[in-house]
Amino acid sequence: MDTLGIFVLISYLGLSSAAGVHLGDLQQNLAANGSVVVSPLNTTDAFSVSINLSQSTVNNCPSLKNAESMALMELLTRLTAPCRYDRMVPPVVHNKDGEEVPMDIYARFYIYVMKNLDSSDLQFTVQGLLQLRYLDPRLAFSSYLPNRRQPIMGESELKKMLWVPHIFLTNEQASTVLGTSAKDELTSIYPNGTVLTSTRLQATLYCWMNFQKFPFDEQKCKTTLESWMYNTTLVQLHWETDNPVSFDKQLQLTEYNLIGSLYNESIRVSNESYMSHGSLEGNYSIISFTVLLTREVGYYVIDYFLPSIMIVTISWVSFWLQADQTPARTTLGCTTLLSFITLSLSQENNLMKVSYVTMSEVWFLVCTIFIFGSLVEFAFVNTIWRRNNDLQLKKRTTKYIVKSTFVPHLKKHRRHGYRRTDSTMSTMSTTSMDKTCGPNNTVITIETPIIIGGSLSREDSAISLDEQDETSTSESSDSSKEKPAQTFATMTPKEVSLWIDRKMRFVFPLSFIVFNALFWTLVYCL
């Protein structure tokens, strides 16, 4: 009620009390000045006046007639007036039968940039445009502007006037809305009440990665959008049927190749035992898309695998060096081993520490075994090279050479029951003669050499005892029954060392080729 109406009311009340003017005339005159209700007055008794003061915006909403002559801002203000629109309440949608149904929200995601796919932090950064489309019948203006086909568009100011669904990224670590002078947000309202919101954002998302086939791994990084406040009884999320997830044609990654994407819709249950939405319980709608990535292996092949193959090959050069060249073969083996370990450590620093074995670690272990094996082979042939006794072989084959190499004459000496002891003899000069009558009564004289006090070596004493065993006739019956094995070939220790080196020149490369065949088959076929 305005000031003019109150003034007229007081004037008429004063006149009626003084001159007895009828109250009906007063009500007729006040009808055009506001919503004032005056109770009937009794001129003889004290009268009372009841005035109902209320705002015109509550009783009467702003009219939308002649909307064609209104400015867009005025039209939006009247459409979103509190008497018509409550931005705190989601729109109510009915089906064809008039039943209330959940509101469908359709999403589309356009990705401009993907970067910082960090294996150590298990995260990646994405810049994209997120669009949400839904129907709000309260904002339909086709009946007021039948000739308008274009949507009403605005930025963040328009968005603040509307109800907008709260959608969040469940695996985000940080996110922000992009923009320079203002946030890059665009809101469009179509004549039928369809609302389309577009937001350009940047988000750092968590991505669980599996490195079992590193560096030949394929990663699947997932992005999940979920309704925060409203469960499936009110809001349901869906992907657009046409290109729900798309990528910029100029999108390039430094370490990965983008091979495609998958998208999915699901439901998450929130209850007392799984409080994903705080104190809110119910089923919440989820939409997600997964980016399929394959790692670029060019860098690792050139900087790791080829150099490691060359280092392993260089370690085999020692097989062409003579077994007594200790400095050369030792230096070559140690240098190649240390070089390969240094090369591997520089690559492993790029990988997150995981509890399972990766393909790169398998490669590292096998290559280390090959390099270390060449060092062990040198130590073995060098030991054989320094032996003094020849090897007695039945046949000059690998079987008997290896057997004679690992099982020396010690076995034969133990079989005859002799112990290797150091014998010390004092200075003496004796000549012993064993006379044995031959078939023709011939006397055989055996002269024993004089041994001047000294210590016999283990090997010489064993040989001396062995020779006496073969010529003596007074041995026990058990030892006389055993006959020494017949030998058909003899090899010197140097010949054995050279023979082993020649064999290793083929065994090591062939074994490494077989390993490579198995390794690359597992990499690309499993």
Curated annotation (Swiss-Prot):
Gene name in the database record: pHCl-2
Positions of transmembrane segments: 301-321, 328-347, 361-381, 506-526
Protein name: pH-sensitive chloride channel 2
Gene Ontology CC: one annotated term: microvillus membrane
Catalytic activity line of the entry: chloride(in) = chloride(out)
PROSITE patterns documented for this protein: NEUROTR_ION_CHANNEL
Swiss-Prot/TrEMBL keywords: Cell membrane, Cell projection, Chloride, Chloride channel, Endosome, Glycoprotein, Ion channel, Ion transport, Ligand-gated ion channel, Lysosome, Membrane, Signal, Transmembrane, Transmembrane helix, Transport
Effect upon mutating residue 296 to F: Results in zinc-elicited currents with increased rise time and deactivation kinetics in Xenopus oocytes
Region spans: Disordered: 463-488
GO molecular function term, any single one: zinc ion sensor activity
